[in-house]
Structures are given as C-alpha cells and as structure tokens.
C-alpha cells in the first residue's frame, strides 16, 4: 500500500490543478472590464452594460453588428470602420465553449440556454421590480457585472 503513496501525491496535485482550471474556464464568459476594447465599452455602454463577449457565440455578435440600424428597437448605427473593429474584437472573444455554443433566439443573452439555467429559480415577478427593470439589466443583481464579475456569492436581488 505504501508503494502507491508517492504516485498518489502527484496524481492528487494534477487533479487539483485540473479542477481549478476547469472552474476558471466554467466562468470564462466573464471578462474584466479593463480588458474590454475601449471602442466597444464607449459605444455599447452608452446605452446598456457592455456585456462580456463570451456571453454569446461569434455568429450572434456578427448578426447583431450587421443590424445596428435596428438594434432592439433603437438605431445604434456606427461608422463602418468602427463596426469592423468592434466586430473583430467581439468575434475573437466570443464564446466558443460548449456552454454557450448554441445561438439563442433573436441573439438575446437573456434567451440563451445557459442564462435560463442560471436564472430558472427566480420568480417572474423579480424581473418586473422597478429596481430590476428587465432581464437584460445584469447590474441590478450582479453588483460587479460592469467589472465582468458575475459570481453567485455577490448577487443581491433588489426587493
């Protein structure tokens, strides 16, 4: 039995490292705010939170940028060169892992499978509260969302 102990220690270390790496990848939708493309932050956060690009697959971002003249009921048109710059950055940082690979209906983060799974326990009335406003207002409950931090331990649901 003691002959296996030296082999178990490296295996345990590798298992712990793999587990930590897996946990980090599991929440890789988040992106620190200071690593966002300044043009993306400036243009998109002028109207709503600059959502981390990992919340949608590249195809969704591409479609969204191709229809900025009718962006969820608003004209968010930008200079074509700026659209290309933002698009290149969004596509490079878009989600590609299994959890967000599928394209949500109408390219809405709030209609994605992962979003529904993470928020399924919330009563529909929560979304109607004045302090929340809508499912797209991440900052209402995720108080550090503007920093790319969606940790469940920091969620505060307004009353």
Residue ranges of predicted features:
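Sequence context surrounding c-type heme c attachment/ligation sites in exported
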Residues: 26-88, 92-159
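Bacterial N-terminal signal peptides
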Residues: 9-22
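N-terminal secretory signal peptides that target proteins for export/translocation
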Residues: 1-7
